Amino acid sequence: MLYPTPIAKLIDSYSKLPGIGIKTATRLAFYTIGMSADDVNEFAKNLLSAKRELTYCSICGRLTDDDPCSICTDSTRDQTTILVLEDSRDVAAMENIQEYHGLYHVLHGLISPMNGISPDDINLKSLMTRLMDSEVSEVIVATNATADGEATSMYLSRLLKPAGIKVTRLARGLAVGADIEYADEVTLLRAIENRTEL
């Protein structure tokens, strides 16, 4: 169906979001048009503000509005342990269980030979720099239980073990193919408590 240009552009914008097909984009566009002017202005303001004010922590790579982030600058956290995650959303999931008190490192992706993503394409270089300049004795690999997550964890294990750093992996409370951000808090707690050495 042919829509007026402003609606067509809005549909196109929404359809660029992950998991949003043309039907959902159309629904969102029409819903947005039906919102009050104040709500639309607030939505647009918040979207622009998030894009403008957020950055990645120069230490851990987590999405933050401070650099370095509040976790990296918290001296009460365990400085000897780093939990390595694929995405900033995974940090939020781990923080919600309130049982892990170490540091984080966000990779912004996983090694994926099938997709042409090599170790140089993810945030590994800064992890290696952190490990050389710190007192870290354990790295917990908390990548998703997928082929790419496994490839990344094995790569990290082979890279870090010769340096004398203990490398562990979250326990298998997480289902194969499951994303950490969608796991419930009890599952995440059990996974971190029962992590295994690689």
Curated annotation (Swiss-Prot):
GO terms for biological process: DNA recombination; DNA repair. Gene3D superfamilies: 3.30.60.80, 3.40.1360.10, 6.10.250.240, RecR Domain 1. It comes from the Bacteria. Pfam families: RecR_C, RecR_HhH, RecR_ZnF, Toprim_4. One of its GO terms (molecular function) is zinc ion binding. PROSITE patterns: RECR (PS01300), TOPRIM (PS50880). Keywords: DNA damage, DNA recombination, DNA repair, Metal-binding, Zinc, Zinc-finger. The keyword Oxidoreductase does not apply. A zinc finger (C4-type) spans 57-72. SMART domains: TOPRIM (SM00493). Residues 80-175 form the Toprim domain. CDD domains: TOPRIM_recR. The keyword Glycosyltransferase does not apply. SUPFAM superfamilies: Recombination protein RecR. May play a role in DNA repair. It seems to be involved in an RecBC-independent recombinational process of DNA repair. It may act with RecF and RecO. NCBIfam families: recR. Belongs to the RecR family. PANTHER family: RECOMBINATION PROTEIN RECR. This is Recombination protein RecR.
